[in-house]
Design a protein with these regions (language model features):
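Intrinsically disordered, low-complexity boundary segments flanking structured domains
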Residues: 2, 80, 103-105
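Glycine-centered tight beta-turn/hairpin loop motif at sheet-sheet or coil-to-beta transitions
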Residues: 78-80, 101, 137-141
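Short, exposed beta-strand/loop patches in secreted or surface proteins that constitute
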Residues: 21, 81-85, 106
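N-terminal cysteine/histidine-rich coordination modules
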Residues: 1-60
């Protein structure tokens, strides 16, 4: 006879479901608790965090919610991930969400940027994806990494490819120029799919 062990979230103690739960270094959290976390935290990063780290992160998220409510941007670059810049306060937001407050999108300080990379990840059949990677220091979030192209892998020889690369460059150049940053910026690094 099979036995089923019922597990509870180590944070809110509700019953875990098979989908959306996240594994931590010293526990597991439910989908509802995971949805409160920053969208920029990857599963790999979560596995290195403790329950105490998550509790601290949730305190940051509460403060961020108040911050995003008062966030005033003066520049916008629209795209799959849109960029919102507050030049006066040297802050920015990158988000897929239409409603930044409802999403509790992370407000990032420009001086926390350590390096930026535009990366082409090759796939099969002469196709690729274009990513922007922004590494941060002295920030609750350590990196922002996102795919620029709207659809799955794009053909190297298509207009969509050129438009996507130009969109990535525009987004990154806008960040660097708006804040007059002197950061390590790699415009083009080509990796194979296996290196990603």
């Amino acid at each position: 006879m099979d036995t089923f062990i019922e597990l509870n979230c180590d944070l809110c103690h509700s019953k875990l479901t098979p989908y959306g739960s996240k594994v931590l270094k010293d526990g597991i959290i439910c989908r509802n608790c995971a949805e409160e976390l920053s969208k920029w935290l990857t599963d790999k990063q979560l596995k290195q965090l403790s329950l105490q780290d998550i509790e601290n992160h949730l305190q940051y998220r509460t403060k961020n919610l108040e911050h995003i409510k008062n966030f005033k941007f003066d520049k916008v670059i629209k795209g799959r991930y849109s960029l919102y810049i507050d030049s006066e306060n040297r802050e920015f937001v990158i988000s897929k969400a239409m409603d930044l407050v409802a999403d509790n999108s992370d407000v990032i300080r420009a001086d926390s940027i350590e390096s930026i990379q535009i990366q082409k990840v090759n796939n099969e059949n002469n196709c690729c994806d274009i990513f922007v990677n922004i590494n941060l220091i002295n920030s609750e979030i350590t990196s922002l990494s996102f795919k620029v192209n709207q659809f799955s892998a794009i053909d190297f020889n298509s207009d969509i490819y050129n438009d996507t690369v130009n969109q990535a460059i525009l987004l990154v150049d806008t960040i660097i120029n708006s804040f007059q940053l002197d950061v390590d910026y790699t415009k083009y690094k080509i990796n194979t799919q296996g290196d990603k």
